[in-house]
From Swiss-Prot:
This is Pyridoxine 5'-phosphate synthase. The active site is at 45 (proton acceptor), 72 (proton acceptor), 193 (proton donor). 1-deoxy-D-xylulose 5-phosphate binds at residues 11-12, 47, 52, 102. Its main location: cytoplasm. Disulfide bonds: none annotated. It comes from Shewanella oneidensis (strain ATCC 700550 / JCM 31522 / CIP 106686 / LMG 19005 / NCIMB 14063 / MR-1). One of its GO terms (cellular component) is cytosol. It catalyses: 3-amino-2-oxopropyl phosphate + 1-deoxy-D-xylulose 5-phosphate = pyridoxine 5'-phosphate + phosphate + 2 H2O + H(+). Keywords: Cytoplasm, Pyridoxine biosynthesis, Transferase. Catalyzes the complicated ring closure reaction between the two acyclic compounds 1-deoxy-D-xylulose-5-phosphate (DXP) and 3-amino-2-oxopropyl phosphate (1-amino-acetone-3-phosphate or AAP) to form pyridoxine 5'-phosphate (PNP) and inorganic phosphate. The gene is pdxJ. Its EC number is 2.6.99.2. GO terms for molecular function: pyridoxine 5'-phosphate synthase activity. Belongs to the PNP synthase family. Pathway: Cofactor biosynthesis; pyridoxine 5'-phosphate biosynthesis; pyridoxine 5'-phosphate from D-erythrose 4-phosphate: step 5/5.
Amino acid sequence: MSRILLGVNIDHIATLRQARGTSYPDPVHAAAVAEHAGADGITIHLREDRRHIIDRDVYLLAKTLKTRMNFECAVTEEMLNIACEVKPTYVCLVPEKRQEVTTEGGLDVAGQLDKITAAVSRLAANGIQVSLFIDADKTQIDAAVASGAPLIEIHTGCYADAKTADEEAKELERIREMAKYAHGKGLIVNAGHGLHYHNVKPIAAIPELYELNIGHAIVARAAIDGLATAVKDMKTLMLEGRRGE
């Protein structure tokens, strides 16, 4: 049985920081905690609007990570320049719309093959392995192969957002089929988006999947699981302060 890896996305640690414009919680610290807990890699998305991860995070993480950085970005000159300077292990090219809350779908590789191929070639020339975030679709998988990218990440959002058991089963089967198809084409196949503690097992059971990238669910679970300790620690400090300790 092949091992499956976990890439922990720490974007929403940064979201919490940016909500108040503070210096904490620090995603760099969060990455170290995640690595210590068993994360096989750290995923970050530097968006053009810098809504959560900021440039400072990227450069510090490049120096401090003990595992691997998976750097998600749009296919823009600015982002490609940053990627080529930082040289993460992986760059995952994703679609990006300013008004979206989170990435809403896969990259249309087939519709912009020349642009994607040029980006893949440029990143590869800098020693970076390129992944393309795409829907579970044969046309997009074939285009990914044509672009020269060695990896894809299958968008699992439709599976995660399924409203009925039948819809979920249909999406799961589609992901299974496309993971097998892509693997047969020689691609390394990852998956992610919307995965959480109640839907991850069927995805993790797909033998062709190499790594799952999961973030929001882990950060949300951490906020609840760590809340009791955080409240107790704050109450202790307040009581010590009142006693003059």
